[in-house]
């Protein structure tokens, strides 16, 4: 588990290209994962995380599950998609695992629920910026989790945003539409499941 903001050997499961850097970029800067698994790419031409991993000599796996929007819900996903995610993660049994908690986007919640049901000792990062929007009621959502650590450093936050700008140029509109959340320069928060209140969505 996280010890002083570092993990010895871990994989990162991101929902979409950019989710790992946005939610865990400060961790990434000082502690690179062995592998990043990108779940929802939809378009196989999407090379954003692929290029990041190549530059930093990190293994990268793209599951190419269909992109789903908040409007779509999870109706596009089938049992084979769930099986594909589980079987891929099982290949890294000896590794620590980090993913997003699932607050604020149905795709994030779908992934989080499956990981909770099938794997132990997973670290969940607070979704940025989704979980900071009032309608997502993070305080209620987070009752199912126990906080492990927060990484707070304005300089590191700026560095992770520079990474975001460099590798995820097509997503830079977030810096405008969600500006007030970026201006907060919030800590990165990491949690584990509260086994007394296990949540499956």
What are these regions (language model features)?
Residues 1-120:
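Active-site beta-strand->loop->alpha-helix modules in alpha/beta enzyme cores, enriched
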Residues 2, 48, 55-58, 72-77, ...:
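The feature marks non-catalytic terminal segments
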């Amino acid at each position: 588990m996280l010890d002083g903001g570092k993990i010895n050997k871990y994989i990162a499961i991101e929902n979409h290209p950019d989710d790992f850097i946005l939610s865990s970029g400060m961790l990434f800067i000082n502690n690179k994962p062995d592998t990043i698994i990108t779940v929802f790419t939809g378009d196989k031409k999407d090379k954003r995380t692929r290029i990041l991993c190549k530059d930093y000599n990190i293994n990268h796996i793209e599951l190419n599950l269909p992109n789903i929007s908040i409007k779509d819900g999870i109706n596009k996903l089938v049992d084979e998609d769930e099986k594909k995610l589980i079987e891929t993660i099982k290949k890294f049994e000896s590794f620590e695992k980090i993913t997003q908690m699932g607050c604020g986007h149905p795709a994030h919640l779908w992934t989080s629920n499956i990981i909770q049901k099938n794997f132990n000792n997973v670290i969940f990062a607070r979704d940025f910026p989704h979980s900071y929007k009032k309608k997502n009621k993070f305080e209620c959502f987070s009752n199912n989790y126990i906080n492990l650590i927060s990484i707070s450093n304005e300089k590191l936050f700026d560095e992770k945003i520079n990474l975001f700008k460099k590798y995820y140029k097509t997503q830079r509109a977030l810096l405008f539409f969600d500006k007030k959340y970026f201006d907060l320069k919030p800590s990165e928060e990491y949690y584990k499941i509260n086994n007394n209140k296990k949540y499956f969505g």
